[in-house]
Amino acid sequence: MRTRYLLWALLALAITSCQGGKTAAGDGDGGDTVKMKYAQLLTIVKHGGEYAEHDGEYAEVTIANPWKEGTLLHRYILVPKGEEGNKTVARLAMQRSAGARCVTDTVRTPVENSAVFTSPHCQLLYELGCGQAIRGVCDLDYINIQDVKKRAASAGNHGSSSAIADCGSSMAPDIERIIALKPEAILVSPFENSGGYGKLDKLHIPIIEAADYMESSPLGRAEWMKFYGMLFGKDKNISTTVAGKALTTVAGKASEATLPASCELKADSLFAKIEKEYLKLKAEAGKLPKGLSILTERKTGNVWYVPGGQSTIGILLKDANARYIFSDDKHSGSLPMSPEQILAKGSQVDVWAFKYFGGAPLSQVQLLQEYDGYKALAAFSRGNIYQVDTSTVPYFELTSFHPELLLREFIILAHGSRFGKLKFYKK
């Protein structure tokens, strides 16, 4: 065990960005590229095994930098654990030292001990049957997953092998707790111009930069589950358990169940189901007349953040056949607007939908106390205000990788209840 960690620590080198282009870590076999139908930032190439004559399988994963065209955000080499994997790691290390163009993080799979900084990825791992691999989280108060909270509460019980450590804030994580966890990988959400990860970079632990939220296509983001399935995937003959019990989760609730042993296979089948349902809903909405106009979010300080026209939310509104005042915008992230800009362009919006955290839904009186300008919105005066409490409703946990759920929600807001009842938003 000690030897394995020493080998891994020597080879796992951090990377913040590098030039784009073909891999420098490959061994010349060309590999087999996993076809991505929607994800534009993610490339996966499988090497070895059936793809070449030599022994030793591994996968190469590259993530394009969403903020700097033509460069890579990160590159990973996923190598199975075991003796054959050790040989593959050594061989690849020699090739990289012989002139690699880009430093690469080596990750031994399956990852069985990880620190996960975001609640949507925690939820996804549970859904893939890999929740047992979560051993540390950040921003625990904002995670709406029952089993995570239960396992975090048992962290003081040293006899609990399934406990989850509270690693503090994702913006300033508790480094000592992370070191004590000895995670095999740390999954974080990257930001533009973040300047790196500070002390985390010095731990020589692979940092998985989950840039899926920067995909412009909702299905593109969901397709990243194929990558996460490979990271946490298990041998088809290995069972998935926590303290002797298999776990699954629906809407944040954990229960005993029989789970597929391979997170990778589960990810492939789950994405296929999500894609089918999403495209079905999109086609049905496209047959309807143009729907109501929808404005999202509310003022934060002096800024009103709204989805860019090419963001996942912007595309969801388009696919719902709703009208969106920033549909012509070309940004894939959020747009920081002044309240005056929003009111000038969106005063006549039909529906106002936003999220809040904790407490009762905000009344119109409370909203006006927050910002008197809200009264200029037609949706406000007509009472077409829809809210979702993310402290009790697993909105982020469920919708991030299940865009079909949010698409249905927006279709109902834009076209009425013919598509069923709202699951998240309440009037």
Residue ranges and their predicted role:
Residues 8-16:
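Bacterial N-terminal signal peptides
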Residues 6-8, 249:
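General helical structural elements
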Residues 1-5:
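Positively charged n-region of N-terminal signal peptides that target proteins for export
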Residues 18-427:
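N-terminal ligand-binding lobe of clamshell/alpha-beta domains
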